[in-house]
Amino acid sequence: MDLAAMKERQQRIRNFSIVAHIDHGKSTLADRILEMTDTISKREMKNQILDDMPLERERGITIKLNAVALTYHAQDGQDYIFHLIDTPGHVDFSYEVSRSLAACEGAILVVDATQGVEAQTLANTYLAIDNDLEILPVINKVDLPSADPEGTKKQIEDEIGLDTDEAVDISAKTGVNVDQVLEKIVQDIPAPTGDLEAPLKALIFDSKYDDYRGVVLSVRVKEGTVKKGDKIEFMNSKAVYEVAEVGINSPKPLARDFLMAGDVGYVTAAIKDIKDARVGDTITDANHPTDKPLAGYRQMQPMVYAGLYPTDNAKFNDLRDALEKLQLNDAALTFEPESSQALGFGFRCGFLGMLHMDVIQERLEREFDLDLITTAPSVTYHVNLHDGSTRNVENPAEMPDVTEIKSIEEPFVKASIMVPNDYVGAVMELCQRKRGQFDTMEYLSDTRVNVIYHIPLSEIIYDFFDRLKSSTRGYASLDYEIDDYRPSDLVKIDILLNGDRVDALSFISHRDFAEERGREIASKLKKIIPRQNFEIPVQAAIGSKIIARTNIKAYRKDVTARIHTGDPDRRAKLLDKQKRGKKRMKAVGKVEVPQAAFMAVLQTDEEIDN
């Protein structure tokens, strides 16, 4: 293809993402666009076509960004090349959204006409504005009886400040007016710019590991071209490879002769060392390199840490390999080796939130056939010691001795909770119960309020979202960001089973609630840990002080069952022998602790009972 033809082709490219709050219909709109552009045949069509991870389809959510190329025959008679990047909506995966937007010139903002603007609608719109994208508002689910398209448009104008005069009312489910969205993409989203003759400059916005092809890079070419046989250099790692294949996803991989400035596609180069190909790096021509790399991504800081341990210690290296491969596909995941007296060798992993942690554990078990135990998640505490030093503690078991500690600071988040007026009282009560500090309250309209609280992250990570939904009948939506560290009166609580401290069950609590939490956890463990044939004392302790105790009763095996009646001496002998055996087992016996026990530290009593 000559330069003039390439420039003409570049003018017909449109790169865009679909962003929205969770459940507002992003993936359904992506399905309709693929269907209406004949990218997917009716026979191959299924719901959530871009959510190719089985886990995404089961949960009905998007976890990974996904890029697909399609051709649209517009009303002006020209064929346009669309690169659509579907993005997640859950707050835990906002990092995926920011990476997607960096590869685009425009974003379709989908808002559910029955729900209106919600917390992640705002958060994702601000991400799009930060990336200087053209935003097309689309009002979805207008076919539902409870839809209020005009009220939703007013919310978008009042709360986001976007003009909605040309917003399109659609039903992604039935396809109503989706053709108008396709035309708006052509008319309103600008074509990419980028010098076709400049040295190659391409941003890696995603990557995954393929057993046959090595690392497969998802790239947005900003300048120049790349083709099979080219020598490419990773500007960060300085590694050089020869390109084996370039292509597009449509949505299956299709090899192409080249990728040029403006294209979104994939590059393979027999990359076997995962560390060479980091998301956010720039690839350039090794023989004619560009002078400076593209701005990469802000490295995400994990918000939640948990221990991941193989149930079989021999699988430790398998777990390491699996985590390395997942990290390639999920740059927000961090991990480092750690050991536990109770669980052996494993990894301390950092996650963006509880859903992220859940998804990683499930992917490790499914995709890599691992059997894992996950410890209760915790946050990073800043521990100021009497000697003037400060230690960051991610694992409660590593908390220094209480005599060394001068003060402890914990991370707080700034939580924005959008809620109907009727539920403001319930939201404030929940936030107070979770040690929240009130900031402000903004009235968004006559019926909706945005309540802002500063809440300890440790109170948010587990059941806050579920409790928020249940106390507001599902009407509240939450967005949060790390705010700062604040001093708190915190103590470490150890759990002892049969007199032995189980390091993996240690947790941090505010001193005011420590005794109550200790009693709660002890009684929960009593329900969860199966009875064994000796009595197990369950104790909670702060330092050497026991603050709670309960006992798991022993099974009583009927050793006299086979004795005929009328032999009291024999019966007494057997019972005495059983008693002596139990004493011995108690001294050497190991308590079998199920996975549920490690999560019980964070669960509510109702969840244990169900």
Curated annotation (Swiss-Prot):
Q: Which UniProt keywords apply?
A: Cell membrane, GTP-binding, Hydrolase, Membrane, Nucleotide-binding, Protein biosynthesis
Subcellular location field:
Cell membrane
Q: Where does the tr-type G domain start and stop, copy by copy?
A: 11-193
User: Which PROSITE patterns has this protein been placed in?
Assistant: G_TR_2
Listed Pfam families = EFG_C, GTP_EFTU, GTP_EFTU_D2, LepA_C
Concerning HAMAP family, the annotation shows: LepA
Name of this protein = Elongation factor 4
Task: Give the species this sequence originates from.
Answer: Limosilactobacillus fermentum (strain NBRC 3956 / LMG 18251)
What's the gene? lepA
